[in-house]
C-alpha cells in the first residue's frame, strides 16, 4: 500500500511527523538542507526516525554533487557532473573519477543509514537552468559512459540508482520547479538523442529506478512525462523493457500543477505508471493526499510495486569513523574536492 515519500520541517523529528510517517500510504521520506546542521545532527535525526517509526522507511536525499548536495559541511565536496568531461582530458581517467565519485557519495550516505540518493542525472546538455552542470555532457555517448561509471561506484557501495529525468530534461529552458516546461522538438530527435542513455543503461540492467520529468513533449503526448501512460507504460516499460521502480519527481513542484490538485496529481501519476510519489514542501497537500488518495490496484500490481520498493533499500552499511580512515576514502576526498574547486574557479 505504501507509495508516498514526504519531507520533514526541521532538524528534529516531531511527533506529528512520526504519525504521518506511520500512515500506511507513506513509503519513506526525503531529506533537505533545512534538515541538516552538521554530520552528528543528521546522523542522530536518521537514527531517531529509524527508532520511532515502527516500519521500514526508505530514507532518501539529493546528494548528486556540485550544486545539488544537501549535506556539505563534514562531507566530501563532490564535483559537478559536467566537470569530469570538461576538466579531465584522458577518457579512462574521466571514467575512473566518475566511479570514485559515485562510490564516495553512496558510501557517505549509507554511513548515515540513508538508503538512496537520487542519482545519476542522465539529461543531455547544460542550457536548461534546472539542469546546467548537473549533466555529465551534451552528447548521449559520453553521458552513457560517465553515468555507467558513476553507477558502478554507487552499486559497489551498496546503493540503488535512479536515472533522471526521463526521457530527458536537458533541452527545455524553463525550470519545472517554477512552471510546466514544453519540449517542442520532433519525437525522432528525442528518441535518437535524449532517450539513448536511459535505453542503454536499462539494457545493461544498471538502473534500479527511473524518475520522469515534469515536461510535456508536445510531439509525443499532451501530459507531462510524470503523468503520461505513453512515456511510462508504452515506452519505458514495454519498448525499453524497464522492470525497476518509477518515482514521480516532486509533485509539489509548479511543473506538476498542470495535472491538477495534489490528490489528482497523485492519482494521475499512479495511473500513468509511477510506483512511488514524491510530495515535498506542501504539508497541507500531504494531509490531503493521505486523507483522500484511494489506491485502486489489483493484488499482482500491488505486490509488484512493493517488490520494486524493496530493491531500493541500501545493501551495505559503512561505519563513518572506519570509512573516513580508509585509504580509498582519503584519496577520493582529496581528488574530488580539488576537482570541484577547479570547476568552481574555471
From Swiss-Prot:
The record's Gene Ontology biological-process terms are: carbohydrate metabolic process; cell division; cell wall organization; peptidoglycan biosynthetic process; peptidoglycan turnover; regulation of cell shape
Gene3D superfamilies linked: Glycoside hydrolase, family 3, N-terminal domain
Q: Which UniProt keywords apply?
A: Cell cycle, Cell division, Cell shape, Cell wall biogenesis/degradation, Cytoplasm, Glycosidase, Hydrolase, Peptidoglycan synthesis
User: Organism's domain of life?
Assistant: Bacteria
Q: What does this protein do?
A: Plays a role in peptidoglycan recycling by cleaving the terminal beta-1,4-linked N-acetylglucosamine (GlcNAc) from peptide-linked peptidoglycan fragments, giving rise to free GlcNAc, anhydro-N-acetylmuramic acid and anhydro-N-acetylmuramic acid-linked peptides.
Q: Which residues form the active site?
A: 177 (proton donor/acceptor), 249 (nucleophile)
> Which residues are substrate-binding?
62, 70, 134, 164-165
**What is the name listed in the Swiss-Prot or TrEMBL entry for this protein?**
Beta-hexosaminidase
Enumerate the residues marked as the site Important for catalytic activity.
Answer: 175
Q: In which pathway does it act?
A: Cell wall biogenesis; peptidoglycan recycling
Q: Tell me where it mainly resides.
A: cytoplasm
Record-stated family: Belongs to the glycosyl hydrolase 3 family. NagZ subfamily.
EC code(s) of this entry? 3.2.1.52
GO MF term list:
beta-N-acetylhexosaminidase activity
State its location(s). Answer: Cytoplasm
The cellular component terms of Gene Ontology attached to this UniProt record, alphabetical and capped at eight, are: cytoplasm
Q: Which reaction does it catalyse?
A: Hydrolysis of terminal non-reducing N-acetyl-D-hexosamine residues in N-acetyl-beta-D-hexosaminides
Amino acid at each position: 500500500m505504501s507509495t508516498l515519500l514526504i519531507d520533514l520541517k526541521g532538524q528534529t523529528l516531531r511527533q506529528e511527523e512520526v504519525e504521518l510517517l506511520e500512515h500506511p500510504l507513506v513509503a519513506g521520506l526525503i531529506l533537505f538542507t533545512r534538515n541538516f546542521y552538521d554530520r552528528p545532527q543528521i546522523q542522530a535525526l536518521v537514527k531517531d526516525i529509524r527508532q520511532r517509526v515502527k516500519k521500514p522507511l526508505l530514507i532518501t536525499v539529493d546528494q548528486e554533487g556540485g550544486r545539488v548536495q544537501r549535506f556539505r559541511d563534514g562531507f566530501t565536496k563532490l564535483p559537478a557532473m559536467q566537470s569530469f568531461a570538461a576538466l579531465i582530458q584522458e577518457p579512462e581517467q574521466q571514467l575512473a573519477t566518475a566511479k570514485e565519485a559515485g562510490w564516495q557519495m553512496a558510501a557517505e550516505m549509507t554511513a548515515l543509514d540513508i538508503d538512496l540518493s537520487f542519482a545519476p542525472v542522465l539529461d543531455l546538455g547544460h542550457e536548461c537552468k534546472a539542469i546546467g552542470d548537473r549533466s555529465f555532457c551534451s552528447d548521449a555517448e559520453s553521458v552513457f559512459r560517465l553515468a555507467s561509471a558513476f553507477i558502478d561506484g554507487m552499486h559497489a557501495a551498496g546503493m540503488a540508482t535512479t536515472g533522471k529525468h526521463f526521457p530527458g530534461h536537458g533541452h527545455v529552458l524553463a525550470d519545472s520547479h517554477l512552471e510546466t516546461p514544453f519540449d517542442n522538438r520532433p519525437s525522432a530527435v528525442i528518441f535518437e538523442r535524449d532517450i539513448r542513455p536511459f535505453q542503454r543503461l536499462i539494457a545493461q540492467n544498471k538502473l534500479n529506478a527511473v524518475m520522469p520529468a515534469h515536461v510535456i513533449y508536445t510531439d509525443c503526448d499532451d501530459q507531462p512525462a510524470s503523468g503520461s501512460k505513453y512515456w511510462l507504460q508504452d515506452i519505458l516499460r514495454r519498448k525499453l523493457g524497464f522492470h525497476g521502480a518509477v518515482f514521480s519527481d516532486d509533485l509539489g513542484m509548479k511543473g506538476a500543477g498542470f495535472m491538477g490538485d495534489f490528490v489528482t496529481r497523485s492519482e494521475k501519476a499512479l495511473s500513468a505508471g509511477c510506483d512511488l510519489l514524491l510530495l515535498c514542501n506542501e504539508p497541507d497537500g500531504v494531509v490531503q493526499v493521505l486523507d483522500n488518495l484511494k489506491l485502486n490496484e489489483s493484488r499482482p500490481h500491488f505486490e509488484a510495486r512493493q517488490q520494486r520498493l524493496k530493491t531500493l533499500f541500501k545493501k551495505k552499511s559503512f561505519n563513518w569513523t572506519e570509512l573516513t580512515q580508509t585509504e580509498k576514502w582519503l584519496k577520493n576526498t582529496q581528488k574530488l574536492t580539488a576537482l570541484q574547486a577547479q570547476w568552481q574557479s574555471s
